[in-house]
């Protein structure tokens, strides 16, 4: 049927059940219910692969959304610590917070514009290729360049060509566009340095590598 089938009793009038035909001819039931809390994703949030997500730094308003993801691990890509609210959120919900880009001493492979190094990228990828860390969120301050670097290196590991990797990276950089140094780092990163345990790797990665 194409009309509203049924409303709940008056005491449940905040719930509406709709039974309608969609273009394919198959019935679809949609149940609308106002959430108890605002559900707001973090800045630049996007699924990357199954149970793998990316975003900017989450704040208090994003925590109800993150709870729905049932995160086990958050990779934080920055030299500075995240906000206290995020630290407390991870502690309260038993989420492992991994600092993948803390590099106070620097080094010859230091990436001066954002603190990322070959070593920190590799550490992040070692976590990402282990399904025991999932569901997993990769994030940095704005979810643009640092996160884009790690995800770009992951895409190369998956066999993507550089044009596709660059297109995805630039999709999150906003009106200022991408940084050529980021794209050069992604291109130069040694993907053979990332060890993959196939018994623990996510299925989508195994499919990409097959």
UniProtKB/Swiss-Prot annotation:
InterPro entries: PFA-DSPs, Prot-tyrosine_phosphatase-like, Siw14-like, TYR_PHOSPHATASE_DUAL_dom. Coiled coil: none annotated. Its main location: cytoplasm. It catalyses: O-phospho-L-tyrosyl-[protein] + H2O = L-tyrosyl-[protein] + phosphate. Residues 44-204 form the Tyrosine-protein phosphatase domain. The active site is at residue 140. It holds the Pfam family Y_phosphatase2. The keyword Iron does not apply. Keywords: Cytoplasm, Hydrolase, Protein phosphatase, Stress response. Its EC number is 3.1.3.48. Putative tyrosine-protein phosphatase required for protection against superoxide stress. This is Putative tyrosine-protein phosphatase OCA1.
